[in-house]
């Protein structure tokens, strides 16, 4: 199984993020160069290649809105340090509770509204397509968005 997780493109990971602004356009592929600052435990996104930067790519699409927040589904094409947080912040979309990447205040529990929603892969022996969907956290906002996912 470990080999499967290391192979490029053999696994599809999707995440849900609750953000402060509605994205325009409603879906897009983002490509940035990420520079990791070890001391700050933070990554910075740039549009052009930088020294010691790693290319990062993700696709997002808008799913739904509450009165103040917006739900995005994100598919990672690369797996970089704080990639989703850094890339969304670079286009003005801040994840609820994420002070490090620009959201205005923390969540009461100290967490952020970023959820590993699903993983899809082909079983290495049976070749069966496996899809695992993680339930959303016990939180009213997550519960709201789960109900409105297909609305």
Regions found by a protein language model. Name each.
Residues 1-151:
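RNA pseudouridine synthases
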């Amino acid at each position: 199984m470990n080999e499967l997780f290391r192979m490029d493109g053999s696994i599809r990971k999707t995440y849900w993020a609750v953000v402060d602004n509605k994205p325009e356009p409603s879906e897009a592929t983002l490509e940035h160069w990420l520079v990791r600052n070890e001391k700050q435990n933070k990554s910075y996104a740039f549009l052009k290649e930088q020294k010691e930067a790693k290319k990062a790519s993700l696709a997002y699409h808008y799913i739904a809105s509450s009165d103040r927040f917006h739900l995005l589904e994100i598919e990672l094409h690369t797996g970089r340090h704080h990639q989703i947080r850094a890339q969304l912040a670079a286009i003005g979309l801040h994840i609820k509770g994420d002070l490090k990447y620009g959201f205005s205040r923390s969540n009461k529990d100290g967490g952020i509204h970023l959820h590993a929603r699903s993983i899809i892969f082909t079983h290495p022996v049976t070749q069966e397509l496996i899809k695992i969907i993680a339930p959303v956290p016990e939180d009213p906002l997550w519960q709201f968005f789960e109900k409105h996912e297909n609305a």
